[in-house]
Regions:
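Short, glycine/charged-rich "phosphate-handling" switch motifs in NTP-dependent
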Residues: 103
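C-terminal output helix
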Residues: 110-119
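Receiver (REC) domain active-site loop signature in two-component systems and cognate sites
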Residues: 59
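Acidic, metal-coordinating helix/loop segments flanking the phosphotransfer/catalytic sites
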Residues: 33-52
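Conserved acidic segment of CheY-like receiver
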Residues: 3-14, 19-23, 53
Length: 128
Protein backbone atom coordinates (compact mmCIF):
# COMPACT_ATOMS: atom_id res chain seq x y z
CA UNK A 1 0.00 0.00 0.00
CA UNK A 2 1.24 3.50 -0.83
CA UNK A 3 2.11 5.76 2.10
CA UNK A 4 -0.49 8.54 2.38
CA UNK A 5 0.40 12.08 3.40
CA UNK A 6 -2.50 13.65 5.31
CA UNK A 7 -2.96 17.36 6.03
CA UNK A 8 -5.21 17.73 9.08
CA UNK A 9 -6.73 21.18 9.66
CA UNK A 10 -8.51 21.86 12.96
CA UNK A 11 -8.52 24.81 15.35
CA UNK A 12 -8.86 22.56 18.42
CA UNK A 13 -5.43 21.43 19.72
CA UNK A 14 -6.90 18.36 21.45
CA UNK A 15 -8.52 17.16 18.21
CA UNK A 16 -5.26 17.68 16.31
CA UNK A 17 -3.36 15.73 18.96
CA UNK A 18 -5.77 12.77 18.97
CA UNK A 19 -5.80 12.66 15.16
CA UNK A 20 -2.01 12.86 15.06
CA UNK A 21 -1.60 10.01 17.52
CA UNK A 22 -4.15 7.94 15.62
CA UNK A 23 -2.78 8.53 12.13
CA UNK A 24 0.89 8.32 13.11
CA UNK A 25 0.29 4.85 14.55
CA UNK A 26 -0.49 3.77 11.01
CA UNK A 27 2.82 2.96 9.32
CA UNK A 28 1.31 3.84 5.94
CA UNK A 29 0.44 7.45 6.82
CA UNK A 30 2.37 10.63 7.49
CA UNK A 31 0.80 13.78 8.87
CA UNK A 32 1.08 17.54 8.71
CA UNK A 33 -1.20 19.57 11.00
CA UNK A 34 -2.51 23.12 10.68
CA UNK A 35 -4.45 25.13 13.28
CA UNK A 36 -6.49 27.17 10.80
CA UNK A 37 -7.67 27.36 7.23
CA UNK A 38 -5.25 30.22 6.63
CA UNK A 39 -2.30 28.20 7.93
CA UNK A 40 -3.30 25.27 5.71
CA UNK A 41 -3.48 27.49 2.64
CA UNK A 42 -0.04 28.92 3.46
CA UNK A 43 1.40 25.40 3.67
CA UNK A 44 -0.22 24.43 0.38
CA UNK A 45 1.10 27.55 -1.33
CA UNK A 46 4.59 26.55 -0.16
CA UNK A 47 4.41 23.30 -2.14
CA UNK A 48 2.92 20.95 0.45
CA UNK A 49 1.28 18.19 -1.59
CA UNK A 50 -0.90 16.03 0.67
CA UNK A 51 -2.71 13.02 -0.70
CA UNK A 52 -5.80 13.97 1.31
CA UNK A 53 -6.92 16.84 3.55
CA UNK A 54 -8.97 16.34 6.73
CA UNK A 55 -10.71 19.69 7.16
CA UNK A 56 -12.71 20.85 10.17
CA UNK A 57 -15.95 22.54 9.14
CA UNK A 58 -16.34 25.03 12.00
CA UNK A 59 -13.25 27.20 12.51
CA UNK A 60 -12.96 30.91 13.32
CA UNK A 61 -12.01 33.40 10.61
CA UNK A 62 -11.91 30.94 7.69
CA UNK A 63 -14.21 27.93 8.04
CA UNK A 64 -13.87 24.60 6.26
CA UNK A 65 -16.09 25.43 3.27
CA UNK A 66 -14.28 28.76 2.80
CA UNK A 67 -10.92 27.02 3.02
CA UNK A 68 -12.03 24.45 0.45
CA UNK A 69 -13.16 27.19 -1.95
CA UNK A 70 -9.77 28.92 -1.72
CA UNK A 71 -7.93 25.60 -1.94
CA UNK A 72 -9.59 24.87 -5.28
CA UNK A 73 -8.09 28.11 -6.66
CA UNK A 74 -4.51 27.01 -5.86
CA UNK A 75 -2.58 25.52 -8.78
CA UNK A 76 -2.13 21.80 -8.27
CA UNK A 77 -4.90 21.49 -5.69
CA UNK A 78 -7.98 21.67 -7.88
CA UNK A 79 -8.64 17.97 -7.22
CA UNK A 80 -6.91 17.29 -3.89
CA UNK A 81 -9.31 15.02 -1.96
CA UNK A 82 -10.91 16.72 1.04
CA UNK A 83 -12.76 14.99 3.87
CA UNK A 84 -14.72 17.31 6.15
CA UNK A 85 -14.75 16.66 9.90
CA UNK A 86 -17.79 17.92 11.78
CA UNK A 87 -20.06 17.38 14.75
CA UNK A 88 -23.01 18.33 12.53
CA UNK A 89 -23.86 15.11 10.78
CA UNK A 90 -27.46 15.67 9.68
CA UNK A 91 -28.00 14.35 6.16
CA UNK A 92 -28.69 17.85 4.81
CA UNK A 93 -25.32 19.04 6.16
CA UNK A 94 -23.47 16.00 4.81
CA UNK A 95 -25.10 16.47 1.40
CA UNK A 96 -24.06 20.14 1.41
CA UNK A 97 -20.44 19.22 2.15
CA UNK A 98 -20.40 16.66 -0.64
CA UNK A 99 -21.93 19.23 -3.01
CA UNK A 100 -19.10 21.61 -2.08
CA UNK A 101 -16.60 19.01 -3.28
CA UNK A 102 -15.72 16.89 -0.25
CA UNK A 103 -15.24 13.17 -0.90
CA UNK A 104 -16.54 12.27 2.55
CA UNK A 105 -17.44 13.38 6.06
CA UNK A 106 -16.05 12.09 9.35
CA UNK A 107 -18.29 12.77 12.34
CA UNK A 108 -16.75 14.17 15.53
CA UNK A 109 -16.18 12.82 18.02
CA UNK A 110 -14.45 10.17 15.94
CA UNK A 111 -13.06 6.81 16.99
CA UNK A 112 -9.27 7.28 17.06
CA UNK A 113 -8.75 3.59 16.37
CA UNK A 114 -10.69 3.76 13.11
CA UNK A 115 -9.65 7.19 11.80
CA UNK A 116 -7.07 5.83 9.35
CA UNK A 117 -9.57 3.27 8.06
CA UNK A 118 -12.18 6.02 7.62
CA UNK A 119 -9.72 8.08 5.58
CA UNK A 120 -8.85 5.08 3.39
CA UNK A 121 -12.52 4.20 2.99
CA UNK A 122 -13.46 7.69 1.80
CA UNK A 123 -10.57 7.65 -0.68
CA UNK A 124 -11.60 4.21 -1.96
CA UNK A 125 -15.25 5.25 -2.27
CA UNK A 126 -14.13 8.24 -4.33
CA UNK A 127 -12.00 6.01 -6.56
CA UNK A 128 -8.70 7.50 -5.40
Amino acid sequence: MTRLHVLHVDDEPDIREVAALSLELDADMSLTSAASGGEALDLLQRDLRPDVILLDVMMPELDGPGTLAQLRELPGHERTPVIFMTARAQSSEVNRYIALGAIGVIVKPFDPMSLAASVRGALADAGR
